[in-house]
UniProtKB/Swiss-Prot annotation:
InterPro entries documented for this protein: GAF-like_dom_sf, HrcA, HrcA_C, WH-like_DNA-bd_sf, WH_DNA-bd_sf, WHTH_transcript_rep_HrcA_IDD
A molecular function GO annotation: DNA binding
Family (UniProt): Belongs to the HrcA family.
Functional summary from the UniProt entry: Negative regulator of class I heat shock genes (grpE-dnaK-dnaJ and groELS operons). Prevents heat-shock induction of these operons.
Pfam families, per database record: HrcA (PF01628)
UniProt protein name: Heat-inducible transcription repressor HrcA
């Protein structure tokens, strides 16, 4: 099989003491049974599944230790056990083998995603890619469309009131963005003019993200040359557009129906309903995915690790994708129940992100 770059997983570590081989084997069987069926598993079934010969009583003793460590719990009055969120995290981090996709699987994903390359727009291509990713993973697939890469041409400050100014950003493509800026008290017009000159000398030809990084560095180096009020106007100007990068970005979600498959109990249905509600809160999802763009690899959030979806007991597996210049411009991934098939979904999301990057010229 051809060599492929390794998958880089970015995930918090469980930080638990090393379990002995017997405990690991029993714990692995509990988790794998849960991922396969969604049902609690008891000591009698575990004793049949594990490689080493152990009586149900011995298995129960180990399960009691695992429960004390917070890795498993007993749901309601069931005699069986399920993994906790901490247990799932420990399994994903320390025990699970993230298999590489075989050539046939890669070819299947590549052929499905490459066919979207004839779409009329980037958004349409991503939409089609998501539909295929959702089908491959049997989960809801999400994508945050690319950031605007428009280059800046000019910035201008127009004073509206003693402590308010209009910031006008003009792009090389003719697009104009306006933001109202709160000025520090007592700022003279000369400081506003100097701030405008400082910014214009450094932003031309840069994207918004590039300009912000350049200005933060340049401002640190030029503090001795600028008076304090001018520095404050420059900092306020940078801040005025720093929160708006995600405002014109689209969140596309496909495959909601997959979340309704294989429900095991009424509480599952309630969790899915809560997840649907979370997905409707698109601003929160956009901000969450936007924050994940700083990562170089696959990120995994299990349950309450992701504050947005913590109430719905969901897992999120996401990976950034890139443009022709190799810059991260968006994020795609899947959202589903905590009993996702992690070993399969993780490499699928990773490979899908690589194919989308290729389609975008990355």
């Amino acid at each position: 099989m051809a060599h492929h770059d390794p998958i880089h997983l970015i995930a918090p570590r469980a930080g638990l003491a090393q379990l002995n081989e017997r405990s690991r084997d029993i714990f692995r069987q509990i988790v794998e049974s849960y991922l396969a069926t969604g049902e609690p598993v008891g000591s009698r079934n575990i004793s049949r599944l594990i490689a080493m010969p152990l009586s149900p009583a011995s298995v129960r003793n180990v399960m009691a230790d695992l429960e004390q460590l917070g890795l498993i719990y007993a749901p309601h009055t069931s005699a069986g056990r399920l993994p906790t969120e901490l247990g799932l995290r420990f399994f994903v981090d320390a025990l699970m083998q993230v298999g590489d996709l075989n050539d046939a699987e890669r070819q299947s994903i590549q052929s499905q995603l490459t066919s979207v390359g004839q779409a009329q727009s980037v958004e349409a291509a991503l939409d089609q890619a998501l539909t295929r990713l959702s089908g491959l993973t049997r989960a809801a697939a999400v994508v945050l469309t690319p950031k605007s890469n428009a280059r800046l041409k000019h910035i201008e400050f127009v004073r509206l009131e003693p402590e308010k100014a209009l910031v006008i950003l003009v792009g090389e493509d003719g697009q104009v963005e306006n933001r109202v800026l709160t000025l520090p008290p007592g700022v003279p017009s000369s400081a506003i003019t100097e701030a405008g000159n400082f910014l214009n000398s450094r932003i031309r030809g840069r994207t918004l993200a590039e300009a912000r990084l350049e200005l933060e560095t340049a401002l640190g180096e030029a503090r001795a040359e600028l008076d304090q009020l001018t520095q404050k106007v420059i900092s306020a100007g940078i801040a005025s557009w720093s929160g708006g990068e995600n405002e014109d970005r689209q969140l596309i979600v496909r495959g909601h129906a997959n979340l309704l498959e294989d429900l095991h109990a009424l509480e599952d249905l309630e969790r899915v309903r809560l997840l649907f509600d979370d997905l409707e809160t698109k601003r929160g999802v956009i901000d969450l995915l936007g924050r994940a763009e700083t990562a170089e690899g696959v990120r995994i959030f299990i349950g309450s690790e992701n504050k947005l979806f913590s109430l719905s007991g969901s897992s999120t597996i996401i990976s950034p994708y890139r443009d022709a210049a190799g810059h991260i411009v968006g994020v795609l991934g899947v959202i589903g129940p905590t009993r996702l098939n992690y070993a399969r979904v993780i490499p699928t999301v990773d490979y899908a992100a690589r194919i989308v990057s290729r389609l975008l010229g990355g």
